[in-house]
């Protein structure tokens, strides 16, 4: 009789241990695979603007090559706004390097996340905008006018009128020189703006930042 009780206690003990181990394993799994919207937003911004890939790879499970491509795609999107027919290959590379450097100096702070009833997270982002374009606009206008005056005087003195594409190329070169020289002296930042980012699941159940919010980041 005593042996049966001991056996019963042993079996119960084994079952309890199994339950505890299973529960602990579940807790560990949930902890390891927990989703932190604040960390996700930080990782996404860092890979997008500063080309820091490590955290984003951990968050999404993508390869390093894919993570690096996020930064490259952002640069490509920026360069699409420039007309290819007036940009030389050398000039395109100069602008690309300039914008890559500016992106890495973007200033942002990721705030705490709050969860909505539908499971969407709201993350407040504080951004200090770089004011380089605004700060250099007057100087660019002045130098562009100087170039226009020079072309006008040259034509008045009998020289051929440059083709429109050639003049546009020259203007973009002037603009690059103004921007790069000002950037070398040090960037200035405007007043901080707060932007609310919504992190929600896509059709596949993976979290992502709402596309409309991403568009607001670039304006």
Q: What are these language model-derived features?
A:
Residues 29-109:
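Core segments of small alpha/beta cavity-forming domains
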Residues 110-112, 194-201:
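Hydrophobic/aromatic beta-strand elements that line small-molecule binding cavities or substrate pockets
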Residues 117-127:
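A short hydrophobic beta-strand element
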Residues 127-133, 201-203:
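Beta-strand elements of well-folded, non-transmembrane domains
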Residues 133-190:
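Mixed-charge, low-complexity intrinsically disordered segments
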């Amino acid at each position: 009789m005593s042996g049966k009780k001991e056996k019963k206690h042993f079996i119960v003990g084994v079952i309890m241990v199994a339950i505890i181990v299973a529960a602990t394993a579940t807790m560990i799994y949930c902890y390891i695979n927990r989703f932190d919207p604040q960390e996700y937003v930080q990782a996404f911004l860092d890979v997008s603007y500063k080309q820091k890939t490590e955290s984003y790879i951990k968050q999404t499970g993508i390869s390093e090559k894919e993570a690096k491509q996020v930064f490259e795609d952002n640069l490509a999107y920026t360069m699409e706004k420039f007309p290819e027919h007036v940009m030389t290959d050398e000039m395109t590379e100069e602008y690309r390097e300039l914008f890559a450097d500016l992106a890495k100096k973007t200033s942002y702070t990721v705030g705490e996340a709050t969860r909505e009833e539908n499971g969407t997270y709201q993350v407040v982002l504080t951004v200090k905008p770089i004011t380089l374009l605004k700060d250099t606009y007057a100087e660019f206008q002045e130098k562009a006018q100087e170039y226009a005056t020079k072309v006008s005087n040259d034509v008045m003195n009998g020289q051929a009128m440059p083709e429109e594409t050639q003049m546009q190329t020259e203007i973009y070169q002037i603009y690059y020189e103004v921007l790069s020289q000002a950037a070398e002296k040090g960037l200035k930042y405007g007043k901080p703006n707060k932007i609310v980012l919504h992190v929600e699941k896509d059709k596949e159940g993976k979290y992502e930042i709402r596309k409309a919010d991403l568009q607001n980041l670039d304006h």
